[in-house]
């Protein structure tokens, strides 16, 4: 295919047009007074959302060069979302600001490489200062505040803080759709381990790329399944019950995996295969934990058991299993409460006698998975459109809250980024590196400007007053008041803020140092039917 190539200023200008289109679409959602964006869906009702990464992923531009710029900013939002779970709109606003200011200087003759070094040094200084001013998060009230700010709902903040209190900060918290109109919290027994499906063709929800199994049987073995004949008698038994099957094995490969996938695609039966968690002796112990939780038996040669002789009686059972590409969650295993209690007691006694810190950590993990639960926030709403929007907000809030517990909090509303300006300005740089530093200094103000603008205030006036206010004081865009941000509960996780800045600086620097862009040439349109011919006349040509 022929390629279209642009160089230097033309290349950068085309990409920046794409950056601006995406950023201008996303940044209207920033802050407590941010607006919504309506996304058209091929099927069903439109999605109304203020979630930055969801909007960014939907944008595809007709011009190939502009689309590349937009996709780079979308990557900033996605990366920030993957690392911190929130802050995607802030990252987009920062990227646009750095690119805009940087392009002015590059066009004026500054060296892009020098500017890039200055941006990197300024970003590092800002991140160090953010970590230095961060305050740890502890207590139910502080956790509720973080979640409430992210979700814009005090009620959601209460649900998330209660969920984290009941299953622990690292516990499993999932978000589901409620059948009613009210949002509620439910804690159920469950276990999670870090192994995902072996084939993406096993998913049941193509949008979320997850496999949901309702009331499944669970085959647990430490053997490798390569020959489908080994488990064929068992599969035939399961097929008669019309229930789904989860296979937890050392591995599923050879002819077995494609055979299972083919039957899944054909709709013969619903099956998902995952690798067993852990390694060596720890794997055997974890498989035994799963077997006790689900009321099954581990098919292992250690017990003289063979896969080809296994019956349905050896399978575990659960109310629900959810598998994504990275993890598996087993909810409401069918194991007896007495057997689970005995297993918990055994692990506790091992904890008391172990001297290895590593072993202690792994035993505590197993204990939490076996004795802990899964908190489920059931989201209710009047319409499907409102339900989807609320689910996205709660997911963001949960991620932001975990990030806050992990690295601490700073003043919210973009205030923390303005607070670190003095530290960045103190960097002694010269030439184009100093220009790069100044670009970051201007960009650090941009989130506050945008939050103020979205709330109907003049951003420059707010910035000037903020710079002359005591540290910690900021602008509450929801009320128009100047308050102590942390005391008022307007806070951001430092992980979210620093990730947004780091990712924005990284991609913006790449755009500024771009010297050529290569894109596919648009394919010519198919020739139209010759004019003047009556389509009805074509009948005689057949």
UniProtKB/Swiss-Prot annotation:
PROSITE patterns: CHAPERONINS_CPN60 (PS00296). GO terms for biological process: protein refolding. This is Chaperonin GroEL. Residues 526-542 have a biased composition (Low complexity). GO terms for cellular component: cytoplasm. One of its GO terms (molecular function) is ATP-dependent protein folding chaperone. Keywords: ATP-binding, Chaperone, Cytoplasm, Isomerase, Nucleotide-binding. Its EC number is 5.6.1.7. Together with its co-chaperonin GroES, plays an essential role in assisting protein folding. The GroEL-GroES system forms a nano-cage that allows encapsulation of the non-native substrate proteins and provides a physical environment optimized to promote and accelerate protein folding. It catalyses: ATP + H2O + a folded polypeptide = ADP + phosphate + an unfolded polypeptide. Belongs to the chaperonin (HSP60) family. PANTHER family: 60 KDA HEAT SHOCK PROTEIN, MITOCHONDRIAL. Residues 523-542 are annotated as: Disordered. It is found in: Cytoplasm. It comes from Streptococcus uberis (strain ATCC BAA-854 / 0140J). Its main location: cytoplasm. It is an enzyme of class 5 (isomerase). It holds the Pfam family Cpn60_TCP1. Forms a cylinder of 14 subunits composed of two heptameric rings stacked back-to-back. Interacts with the co-chaperonin GroES. ATP binds at residues 29-32, 86-90, 413, 476-478, 492. The keyword Acyltransferase does not apply. The keyword Hydrolase does not apply.
């Amino acid at each position: 295919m022929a390629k279209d190539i642009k160089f230097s200023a033309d290349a950068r200008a085309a990409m920046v047009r794409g950056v601006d289109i995406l950023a201008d679409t996303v940044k209207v959602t920033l802050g407590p007074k941010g607006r919504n964006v309506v996304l058209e869906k091929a099927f069903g009702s439109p999605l109304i959302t203020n979630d930055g990464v969801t909007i960014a992923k939907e944008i595809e531009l007709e011009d190939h060069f502009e689309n590349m710029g937009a996709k780079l900013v979308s990557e900033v939002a996605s990366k920030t979302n993957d690392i911190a779970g929130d802050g995607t709109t802030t990252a987009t606003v920062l990227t646009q600001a750095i690119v805009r200011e940087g392009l002015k200087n590059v066009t004026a003759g500054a060296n892009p490489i020098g500017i890039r070094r200055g941006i990197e040094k300024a970003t590092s200084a800002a991140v160090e200062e953010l970590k230095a001013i961060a305050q740890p998060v502890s207590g139910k009230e502080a956790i509720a505040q973080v979640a409430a700010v992210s979700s814009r709902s005090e009620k959601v903040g209460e649900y998330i803080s209660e969920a984290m209190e009941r299953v622990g900060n690292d516990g499993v918290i999932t978000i589901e759709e409620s059948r009613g109109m009210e949002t509620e919290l439910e804690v159920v027994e469950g276990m999670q381990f870090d192994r995902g499906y072996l084939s993406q063709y096993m998913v049941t929800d193509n949008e979320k790329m997850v496999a949901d199994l309702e009331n499944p049987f669970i085959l647990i073995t430490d053997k490798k399944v390569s020959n489908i004949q080994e488990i064929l008698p068992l599969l035939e038994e399961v097929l008669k019950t019309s229930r789904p099957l989860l296979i937890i094995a050392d591995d599923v490969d050879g002819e077995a995996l494609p055979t299972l996938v083919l039957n899944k695609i054909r709709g013969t039966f619903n099956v998902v295969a995952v690798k067993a968690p852990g390694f060596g002796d720890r794997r055997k112990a974890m498989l035994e934990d799963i077997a006790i939780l689900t009321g099954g038996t581990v098919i292992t040669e250690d017990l003289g058991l063979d896969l080809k002789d296994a019956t349905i009686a050896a399978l575990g059972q659960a109310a629900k299993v959810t598998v994504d590409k990275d993890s598996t969650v087993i909810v409401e295993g069918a194991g007896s409460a007495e057997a689970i209690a005995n297993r918990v007691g055994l692990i506790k006694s091992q904890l008391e006698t172990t001297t290895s810190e590593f072993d202690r950590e792994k035993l505590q993990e197993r204990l939490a998975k076996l004795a802990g639960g899964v908190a489920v926030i059931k989201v209710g709403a009047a319409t499907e459109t409102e339900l989807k929007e609320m689910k996205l907000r709660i997911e963001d809030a949960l991620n932001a809250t975990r990030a806050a517990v992990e690295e601490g909090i700073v003043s919210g509303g973009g205030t923390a980024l303005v607070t670190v300006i003095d530290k960045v300005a103190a960097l002694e740089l010269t030439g184009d590196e100093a220009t790069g530093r100044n670009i970051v200094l201007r960009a650090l103000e941009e989130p506050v400007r945008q939050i103020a603008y979205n709330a109907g205030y003049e951003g420059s006036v707010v910035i000037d007053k903020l710079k002359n206010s005591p540290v910690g004081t900021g602008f509450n865009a929801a009320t128009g008041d100047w308050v102590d941000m942390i005391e008022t509960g307007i806070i951001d996780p430092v992980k979210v803020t620093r990730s947004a800045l780091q990712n924005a600086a990284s991609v913006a620097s790449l755009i500024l140092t771009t010297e050529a862009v290569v894109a596919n040439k648009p394919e010519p349109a198919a020739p139209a039917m010759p004019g003047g011919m009556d389509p009805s006349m074509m009948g005689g040509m057949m």
